[in-house]
Every structure is written in structure tokens, then in C-alpha cells.
Amino acid sequence: MYVLVCPGIHDPQATQDFLQGLQRVMDEAAFTWLIFPTDRYPAYSAIHISWFLCTQLRSVHLQDWLNQTVAIISFSAGVVGGIATAWSWRLMGGTIAALIAVDGWGVPLVGDFPVHRLSHDYFTHWSSALLGAGQDSFYAEPAVDHLSLWRSPETTQGWWFSPSSPSSPQLITAAEFIATLLSRYNARAVIEDES
């Protein structure tokens, strides 16, 4: 499964820190990672992100590039481009395993694919849910600043909320939450590929 990472408007080192934080809790080699270059294109530009995704997949899969399953992890302004790219990919006939929106406050998140929100504090968590709660979600407790959630997911503690058991949230790190979701959707993609 491909994982498209759509960073926000920040120093690219923060995205490298994010990926290193994920590496500490998951087998990164189980996925093919595509990091959208926000140093060359606007983080919020779905046109540029979609072009990047298509170009990357066509370079590897000449004939069946549209048959590749993609999960999208987006942060801040990248959530704007990420959700629009997910819809673009779906309209072209592609499969979106999930959209994981990290601190996409104020961005409506609705799709015919799983959507998950991570928030740096409780206020952002509940106020963002008004624009599409999605499925399982996470918020940092204690609260952290906006960029720290992206830069240090492995040390950001918080609560995992599941719609299937809303009365029993689980204490977890942001990195563990993301790793669990990616593992879940990767397993589904493998099963679908085999059938």
C-alpha cells in the first residue's frame, strides 16, 4: 500500500521528524511512502498533490497505476489538499484506504472512504467533529502545540476514540494511533489484492 504524506506549511525537517517518530513504533518498510514536496508546491494545492501522486505511481506501475491502494496522511494546510486529492483519486477510479487528517481544523472531511482526525487538543477535536467526525479519532492529552503533534507523534500522548465504543477511550500515542490505522488498512488492501 502507498502512503501519501501531505505536510503543512512548515520547515521540511518537521516532516522528517514525523516519519522518524512513526518508525519508532511501526515497520515502515511495509509501505511505500510518497512525501509531497511542499518546498516546491503549495501544501494546500490538490492539483499539485494529485499530479504528484499520479506521476509517482505511473513511474512504477506503467499499466495498472490507478489500481494501487493509497492511504493519505495530511497535516494542517495539507489537509485541504489531502481531502481534495482523495476525492480526485476516487473520481479517477482509484482506491483510498483512508485519510488521516492531523490537525485539519476547519476543514470539512467527508468521503466514501474512512476518515480519521488527530487533534492537538480537546477543543480542536470536538469543534472539528462538527465538520465531519469520521471514524476513529485521537486528541492529545495533555494538549500540545499544533506543530508538536506533527513533529513528535511518538511522544504525544492522548485519547483514541472509536465510534464503536465511545464510552471507553484508549490512552495511546499519536504515532501508535497512526501505525495501528495504517496496519489495519494495509491488511485490508492485501486481502483485496489477493481476491
Model regions: which residues?
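Conserved hydrolase catalytic core segment
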Residues: 84-97
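Active-site catalytic motif of lipid deacylating hydrolases and related acyltransferases
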Residues: 1-68, 114-195
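Gly/Ala-rich beta-loop-alpha elbow adjacent to hydrolase catalytic centers
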Residues: 72-82
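Active-site nucleophile loop of the alpha/beta-hydrolase fold
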Residues: 100-109, 120-123
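Residue in the alpha/beta-hydrolase core beta-strand immediately N-terminal to the catalytic nucleophile
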Residues: 71, 98-100
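A short acidic (Asp/Glu
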Residues: 14-17, 81-87, 110-113
